[in-house]
Regions:
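Long amphipathic alpha-helical segments
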Residues: 1-75
Length: 76
């Protein structure tokens, strides 16, 4: 079973590999793609955005997170 919190964490950490593998597992388990987007991917981008606003993350972190999200979205 896909651990969907890993998907949010993958986005926050900018881990393309983890984002893709978790998304693949979720799709194999027939989890609704819209749920993945709204409940996990966007949540991860919101978190990294909050960290950026607080000065705890920088532009490279945002770019890595965006790349991880793009990788997950390509599967959907």
């Amino acid at each position: 079973m896909a651990k969907l919190s890993d998907l949010t964490n993958a986005i926050v950490k900018g881990s393309l590999e983890l984002a893709v593998s978790t998304t693949q597992e979720a799709l194999q388990e027939n989890i609704d793609p819209q749920t993945l987007i709204s409940d996990y991917l966007i949540k991860g981008m919101e978190e990294i955005g909050t960290q950026f606003e607080a000065g705890k993350a920088y532009v490279p972190n945002l770019l890595m997170s965006a790349r991880a999200m793009k990788g997950a979205l390509e599967l959907l």
